[in-house]
């Protein structure tokens, strides 16, 4: 009877809903339990499950943890994804900023939930700002002087979402910018919005949240600056610009 009970009960366990603190996956694999329910399966054994490859257009649930030195807080986020050719060829994009709790509800959404986290160029550590305070403490000196593009070992998209995810190159952002961006920034597929930036210096103030977009590319300019996409909501200004590498800008993630 004991064996019969286990046989009848075991197939309906929702393995995909279990999580284990401190474990992460590093590949875009979803897990399907025997009841047909899909879950992330991060940190779980594959016993009793089959795997399927991630399909763009589906949601991607990530358990962000601070122990990896990237996320500034522990939280689980379900990211929406979309296929788009705005970058010049078809890619998969998340439709919200990395670290955001939810997709923005407008291009001027000034909430912390929509803003997500901020990064200095070519650094893996993310920072959050609740509107008044940045955590962890933002560096107050200009020390980011390396002359290299953002690499996979420090790319927060790769480290947090898994292999294949990355920060867009300046060429990809340029193509996005040239595709009627001012009209399509939020209204289009990518749902981009004005999360502002964290300024450099001793104040490290949150600036322009709700009025300006600042997105890093993976491409550096020189010892001081790196390329990024900037959009102003109150004008027709949108362009690829040089941004101080020590400033904290938003990150969007793309997958080939």
Task: Indicate residue ranges for each PLM-predicted region.
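C-terminal, surface-exposed recognition/capping segments
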Residues: 81-82, 95-105, 110-155, 159-256
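Enriched but not universal
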Residues: 17-67, 75, 252-256
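Bacterial Sec-dependent N-terminal signal peptides
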Residues: 1-20
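GGW-centered surface loops in extracellular recognition modules
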Residues: 43-113
């Amino acid at each position: 009877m004991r064996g019969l009970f286990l046989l009848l009960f075991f197939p309906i366990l929702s393995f995909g809903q279990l999580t284990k603190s401190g474990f992460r996956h590093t590949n875009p694999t979803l897990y399907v339990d025997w009841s047909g329910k899909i879950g992330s399966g991060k940190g779980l054994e594959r016993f009793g499950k089959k795997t399927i490859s991630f399909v763009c257009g589906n949601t991607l649930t990530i358990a962000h943890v601070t122990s990896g030195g990237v996320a500034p807080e522990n939280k689980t986020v379900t990211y929406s994804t979309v296929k788009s050719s705005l970058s010049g060829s078809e890619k998969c994009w998340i439709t919200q900023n990395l670290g955001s709790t939810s997709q923005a509800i407008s291009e001027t959404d000034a909430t912390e939930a929509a803003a997500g986290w901020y990064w200095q160029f070519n650094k893996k550590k993310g920072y959050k700002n609740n509107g008044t305070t940045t955590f962890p403490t933002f560096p107050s000196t200009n020390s980011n002087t390396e002359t290299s593009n953002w690499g996979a070992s420090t790319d927060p998209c790769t480290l947090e979402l898994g292999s294949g995810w990355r920060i867009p190159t300046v060429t990809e952002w340029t193509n996005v910018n040239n595709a009627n961006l001012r009209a399509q920034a939020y209204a289009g597929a990518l749902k981009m919005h004005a999360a502002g930036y964290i300024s450099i210096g001793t104040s490290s103030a949150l600036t322009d949240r709700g009025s300006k977009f600042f997105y890093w590319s993976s491409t550096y300019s020189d010892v001081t600056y790196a390329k990024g996409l900037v959009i102003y909501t109150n004008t027709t200004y949108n362009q690829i610009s040089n941004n101080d590498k020590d400033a904290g800008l938003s990150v969007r993630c793309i997958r080939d």
